[in-house]
Amino acid sequence: MAKKGVNKQARTNSKLDQLVTSLERLTVGSMQRKSNRQRPKSRKTSGRVVTAPVSSAALIRYKAPSLNGNSMDSVRLASKSLVIEAVKVGIEYQVSVVPLVPCIQHTWLSGVACYWSKYRWRSCRLVYIPYCSSSFTGYVSMGLSYDYADAIPSDETEMSALKGYTTTSAWAGSEGIKMLSYPTGAVPSGAVVLSLDCASMSKPWYPYISAVAATNLGEKQPELLNQYTPARAFIGTGGGMQGVNGLTAGRVFMVYDIELIEPVSPAMQENLSSTGRSKIDQSISPLTGADFEIVRKVSAISQIQ
């Protein structure tokens, strides 16, 4: 009888040991899971370092413009236009000016917008596309001015104070090529883009103005251009090679979504007399406005009737 009592006590102690071991395992596992849940997650940073590629190339394919019209009185377009064919970078600081108007010469948009009386930008973005090597020295910066009475920035300090200011090495930004095929899409990471704030315009609609009339007006009374366009873009370059002033680094495209209303004859839009000079001021030679350098390549103005 005494031996049976000893065996029974041993079995009881063994079961208690097993129970204690199981409880210890459960406690340790619970603490580990709780520790994992409380471990802080890593946060994403907003900064981004761009590494110079060993080799890269820009491939741009044709994509037909998107055209939508709800009635005979309006049309909506989404496409791209080349507005600066050669962005030049040198040792000296240089600034190019791009007026954000649909009448920029040598663009498909200018040939369509002249048939409409008013316009508004739904989206308007300038995209810098480099085609220089990664060893190219210099930088490109962009900014917006919403008042034509303001002077053109003379250095990078003044440029950096503008709305939408962005700057990068002259070889960076090839990711923006995707935007040329999808003008209303999201901005790819790494793209060098200047975006117009279309939600904060001073007017709901802007009257169309021809390139020649805008040039003449910009020469004599630039502040009046606020009636015809919401803003102008500045593209600044500098920091190039010592002793070199004017190496081509890339191009600037405008990708846009624009709405045009109130159809009108193009002849009424040009504001030109039979001599081909602007009716605003025929004493001013066309294509000399400092604010409209991009249209200086226009020729044969006298042929426009």
From Swiss-Prot:
InterPro entries: Capsid_prot_S-dom_vir (IPR000937), Viral_coat (IPR029053). GO terms for molecular function: structural molecule activity. One of its GO terms (cellular component) is T=3 icosahedral viral capsid. Residues 30-49 are annotated as: Disordered. Keywords: Capsid protein, T=3 icosahedral capsid protein, Virion. Its main location: virion. It is found in: Virion. It comes from the Viruses. Residues 34-46 have a biased composition (Basic residues). Capsid protein self-assembles to form an icosahedral capsid about 34 nm in diameter. The capsid encapsulates the genomic RNA (Potential). Belongs to the icosahedral plant coat protein family. This is Capsid protein. It comes from Poinsettia latent virus (isolate Euphorbia pulcherrima/Germany/Siepen/2005).
